[in-house]
Amino acid sequence: MAQTLSFNGRRRVRKFFGKIPEVAEMPNLIEVQKASYDQFLMVEEPKGGRPDEGLQAVFKSVFPITDFSGASMLEFVSYEFEPPKFDVDECRQRDLTYAAPLKVTLRLIVFDIDEDTGAKSIKDIKEQSVYMGDMPLMTNNGTFIVNGTERVIVSQMHRSPGVFFDHDKGKSHSSGKLLFAARVIPYRGSWLDIEFDAKDIVYARIDRRRKIPVTSLLMALGMDGEEILDTFYTKSLYKRDGEGWRIPFKPETLKGAKAITEMVDADTGEVVVEAGKKLTPRLLRTLSDKGLKALKAADDDLYGNYLAGDIVNYSTGEIYLEAGDEIDEKTLGIILANGFDEIPVLGIDHINVGAYIRNTLTADKNENRQDALFDIYRVMRPGEPPTMESAEAMFNSLFFDAERYDLSAVGRVKMNMRLDLTVEDTVRILRKDDILAVVRMLVELRDGKGEIDDIDNLGNRRVRSVGELMENQYRLGLLRMERAIKERMSSIEIDTVMPQDLINAKPAAAAVREFFGSSQLSQFMDQVNPLSEITHKRRLSALGPGGLTRERAGFEVRDVHPTHYGRICPIETPEGPNIGLINSLATFARVNKYGFIESPYRRIVDGKVTSDVLYLSAMEEAKYYVAQANAEMNADGSFVDEFVVCRHAGEVMLAPRDSMNLMDVSPKQVVSVAAALIPFLENDDANRALMGSNMQRQAVPLLRAEAPFVGTGMEPVVARDSGAAIGARRGGVVDQVDATRIVIRATEDLEAGKSGVDIYRLQKFQRSNQNTCVNQRPLVTVGDEVNRGDILADGPSTDLGDLALGRNALVAFMPWNGYNYEDSILLSERIVADDVFTSIHIEEFEVMARDTKLGPEEITRDIPNVSEEALKNLDEAGIVYIGAEVQPGDILVGKITPKGESPMTPEEKLLRAIFGEKASDVRDTSMRMPPGTYGTIVEVRVFNRHGVEKDERAMAIEREEIERLAKDRDDEQAILDRNVYGRLIEMLRGQASIAGPKGFKKGSELSNAVVSEYPRSQWWMFAVEDEKVQSELEALRGQYDESKSRLEQRFMDKVEKVQRGDEMPPGVMKMVKVFVAVKRKIQPGDKMAGRHGNKGVVSRIVPVEDMPFLEDGTHVDVVLNPLGVPSRMNVGQILETHLGWACAGMGRQIGELIEAYKANGNIEPLRKTIGDVVGDGPKAEQVHEFDDDSVLRLADQWKRGVSIATPVFDGANEADVNDMLRLAGLKDSGQSTLYDGRTGEQFDRQVTVGYIYMLKLNHLVDDKIHARSIGPYSLVTQQPLGGKAQFGGQRFGEMEVWALEAYGAAYTLQEMLTVKSDDVAGRTKVYEAIVRGDDTFEAGIPESFNVLVKEMRSLGLSVELENTKLDEAQAAQLPDAAE
């Protein structure tokens, strides 16, 4: 019999519809974050020291620091991290930052300086390790914990350093002429722009300042006019020949021209080209072949050319004409008169080569290097008088000083590629040759050669990940520190000082704190569900420091670019002002060492596709022909079609199969993780797919997670990489399981000194950043064998290791009494009764007892004027019990605050002295439940300041925690003992002993029975003859003792932390945190959605018996509006409905077969049915080889509905859907007859019914509904505040006022504008009137009117209100009364 495969039932098996085999492994989805930060910190120093990158590079760039006189120097040696004080969970609980102390070893060198010669000799060297603040560490999930909350540092997209050529698209000048410009962007330092103006003069700008002619810049680099012309133009020599001139024949400059006069060969005198003839390339080639070397020219043919060198009389030194002068009658006369018969001429023909640099040189007022340097100095530092030294130093510091200017390796690589240079990427400053190459290329662009750059190409944009952002921030901190160190080194007696006396690490620590706390890229992690966590970590933002701003970003930056293919998702981006500026990394993409995004491709060798995978960036990919992942192939890997659809240089085209070099790895490499989770994405309109991707991130984890029937195969990947489901770190056997932890005895990776036990703590009812509930449930049972990577426990929104954001619901597409108008959703009461869409939310309330001026606040049960009934949930310490059910207004923590003393009468003083304290000294400031929240207390934490006596509740919590730690220690100890003593007895068995415990007969052979007579602790006393075994025994003993002491030490450390007081904000004596779990059932007003952007609000919940039902009596759960599909073009939801219907139909069949098996014991029909469903695709499970137990486990998993995977762009097609429906015994129209639940009548026509995966989104009506009668008012305007958080009112705005004005509702309007809003006196009067039962009131002046008057007065306008009373006769004479 074939070897049976077993299936443990701990993972979900899916029927796979994908036809394209996946050759590349999908990289870990949060690798972007982890790899970047690891490279920055390099915690473990490698052998041979750390390379110059990350933190090491920062220290190397700032150190050594020399004092102003050069008498001492502070050098950097190395750095190391100490273990963090608190682990991740402790930091979360205590609101601390998870960080490790950074220790830097510095060396202070003091020199002796010889006063006469200035020679230095080393006088003293001191080395010391200095504490440089705490460096935040990344958790295993790629997040940081800052002040107790999880944060994510989002990667930033910015323009890559390097050189860019561009033009203004004809916008600057009215003629629409294209003005070309080049810009050299360094990583840090001054920007250099070189640009044309409308007159074709070339200018340079430094740091966007005033422009100077580019020739001045070149002169400042040490060139003179003639050298500049030599660099940019070719020279030719015109010789005098009789009356005319002999000029060289250069065919390359004459292409396409027309001969105005006849062309004569200077050597033979024959006419080679007639006047008026066009010079075709063929004709020019013929002339060259004939041996034409030079042409004859008259004087006027020379006019308009430019001299290539000075015309000098060498005997007298007189310069007649300078290089660059134009040749005309006058200048030619001077040349001939002085007897020159050879003229050097610049090769400028105004067609292929323009005279731009020559014209600039002529227009430039600066003659030499000094003038040019002074000019640049005046531009950069206006108002300062320049000297040669200061100008030279300033110019050098701009581009040629590594401290001030850094192109970075990326910039140098980009520059080399663009300008065809070959310079090492360690050369990080500009060179003269670089500037010349930039100017040369710019001039060539103006001459019509070459292309401008596309700045939105991903080859020109790079990603700055956490590590790099942190590196820049830390460098800023160190530079601030450097100034202070220099000053201190100069002002202090250096001989007696140690390095730590010079260093104040506060600026560096502050820079780090500022970055994590308030940078735009450090964001509060989106933790609604595992998918939102992963997407947040893979996000790319173009905003942030050094990036774009929303207002300035145009359409081009936001648009999808051809280079996004396989790198950035074209679908997932927010709707709204940030659209296109915040993107998501594609599934297979990764970031290379230079920060460019790379995508994987399969190599094609000799026309055959191999499994060899190659990662390329956008720049490298442009030169290849890349076939699509779904191109049809033969079995040997060659293409079926003669012409293949491919991409090349940003275009999609058909090309012959022989020209293909690469092929895409997978169809889903185009999209991001969220988009890859949408089945039938290819059938959805892009706008709706965008909404679908974004809404999956808002799905609330439900009470019972259920994986989708119709998935895409990405679900386990997301669950695993997000860290929501717990995977085994190494193989082993499950030793213990309960709801809070799993203990596994490892069977692999057993190194000496490494614990042989893995304890996995499960999170129970923890609060996430968005108040959703994080809860993990074990999937394994005692005795299970697990392999590395197996799923041990499900987390929030996961089901058997698959991401499960919602529930499968039976949906009918039909109208129902108008309750699904405008995308509303009609639900059955069954969904509420069975808690299908019920979720748990956890609210955190904290209360602090402070030390006030009038005395300390106190947390107590003894609260004045509160009934015993209100205190029923509090313990003797005044803190609510765990498990108490609370509702709005209930006290959670009782607290009293001392009241300000009012002066006392002598009688009161006497009474006080006699009867002691009076209850009126304190007021009740207890924490109560806010309005509208009901729930159950799930956790209470009490924090005490050092030295403050702990109350009974704090002690109880502490005892519980210590018991838990002791249990962990004891379990690990028990497994260790079992392992070690097991190995010990194995070693001793059959050995001849030479010593043993008291009363043992030496020399006898040891056996299990003999050894077992003695207590375990005495087994170590046995010694054996065999020396090898004896030494192994001793090694085992050493290892055992070491492990045991390590365990005990770890336990003691943890206990010490628990017992120690907590660090509190100043003035706080005690803090209590209370966590309340709120169960939210679905109700009208909650927002729901499918995965295809089909969102809606629940409009009504109908009794089950009134819902439409199928022929077998099953009532549908959800009724959706069929009109929501056609105009939105998200047909994927209909295909999902059909396929889900087929899955449920097959699940029903499998359920029936299970019942049959229970009756007759024959499992083969079940095995055959499941085998037929799974099929035989590339990823199909071998069900026919499963043992019987495994078949039953799989059948049990599938009886509610078969799970299938239809990957994006490679999923089930129409035929597959029809086959599945037939296999399930259903109609292939996918429609069913429905009956009205209220009348029992059949509906007129067939209705599409099936299963859709529905999500409940984090927009719950409970969080939004809000009512106010009286509440807080704004300080200045005295108007009610707005919003639920402020307990605000409803704004009656400008337009609403217009509406009342239009109706002439004067009294209503008056109320709205005065007593209901900001008439302070009127408000109280109305209240008093209502209390009296009187309904008359008088409106006064609104406060906002006073604000207006004050504002006008502040502008110098005296505004007075006249208070005059008129009688009726006077009133009648007013102008508007007469009309």
Swiss-Prot record:
Catalytic activity entry: RNA(n) + a ribonucleoside 5'-triphosphate = RNA(n+1) + diphosphate
Pfam families in the cross-refs: RNA_pol_Rpb2_1 (PF04563), RNA_pol_Rpb2_2 (PF04561), RNA_pol_Rpb2_3 (PF04565), RNA_pol_Rpb2_45 (PF10385), RNA_pol_Rpb2_6 (PF00562), RNA_pol_Rpb2_7 (PF04560)
Signal peptide range: none
EC numbers on record: 2.7.7.6
InterPro entries: DNA-dir_RNA_pol_bsu_ext_1_sf, DNA-dir_RNA_pol_bsu_external_1, DNA-dir_RNA_pol_su2, DNA-dir_RNAP_su2_dom, DNA-dir_RNAP_su2_hyb_sf, RNA_pol_bsu_bac, RNA_pol_bsu_CS, RNA_pol_bsu_protrusion
Quaternary assembly: The RNAP catalytic core consists of 2 alpha, 1 beta, 1 beta' and 1 omega subunit. When a sigma factor is associated with the core the holoenzyme is formed, which can initiate transcription.
Protein name per UniProt: DNA-directed RNA polymerase subunit beta
Organism per entry: Rhizobium johnstonii (strain DSM 114642 / LMG 32736 / 3841)
